[in-house]
Amino acid sequence: MNLILLWALLNLPVALTFDPNYKDDITPPYLIYLKSDYLPCVGVLIHPLWVITAANCNLPRLQLILGVTKPSNIDEEKYVQVVGYEKMIHHPQFSITSIEHNLMLIKLQTHIELNNYVKIVSLPKEPAAEDDTCIVSTWAYNLCDHYKDPDSLQNVNISVISKVECLKAYKYMHIRDSMMCVGIVPGRRQPCKEVTAAPAVCNGILQGILTFADGCVLRADVGIYTRIINYIPWIENTIQNN
């Protein structure tokens, strides 16, 4: 793939990219349910052939389900696309002993059909600023049956906080420049069951992928997110070379 084609795919017309003014009661069109024989994860569509998620979501027998609101009742969904994948590519510096560089790209077997229910999200050209409002979206288990797929898609609007504020929530963690924190300090830290690797989309731009949280991000507890803008060269090079 040459650089001109790569640029074109990463800058698709607005009609095919995510509109941040979507309705709160539907699934954000960039959100993907990563279903496996183990625990599920959240993925984000950044290209008709590529999905980004956390590197710890290296899941067995993975299926990628787009356009779904209730994974526990997928037979009643009208706009679902189910695709397989060709390869998973971890960030080369990722280690299972660290929350840093926790990103993975998934190449799909076929190009996704983009429509009103399935769209790509834009990648950042500048970092999210402190106090920017972000939409964090993932699925939750209202019925507390972890042997089934989650039954509730939820979105929460929360703000980017400073490293100083983040350290009030995570006193013993090293918050690096490649990370950002989103949430409310001190937060409630109530236990809940939600699907991991939730994205933080700020002003319509994908700014972060959840790498660690002690609590429940859907209740606005502080989460630590991989800062996407730091990895744009790796993302672009990976897509170009694969």
UniProtKB/Swiss-Prot annotation:
Family as reported in the entry's similarity comment: Belongs to the peptidase S1 family.
SMART domains attached to this UniProt entry: Tryp_SPc
Matches recorded under SUPFAM superfamilies: Trypsin-like serine proteases
Positions of glycan attachment: 157
Disulfide bridges in this chain: 41-57, 134-202, 166-181, 192-216
One GO location term (cellular component): extracellular space
Domain of life of the native organism: Eukaryota
A family per Pfam: Trypsin
Annotated ranges, domain Peptidase S1: 18-240
Example GO biological process: proteolysis
GO terms of molecular function: serine-type endopeptidase activity
Signal sequence residues: 1-17
Location(s), subcellular: Secreted
Annotated keywords: Disulfide bond, Glycoprotein, Secreted, Serine protease homolog, Signal
Protein name as it appears in the record: Probable inactive serine protease 58
UniProt gene name: PRSS58
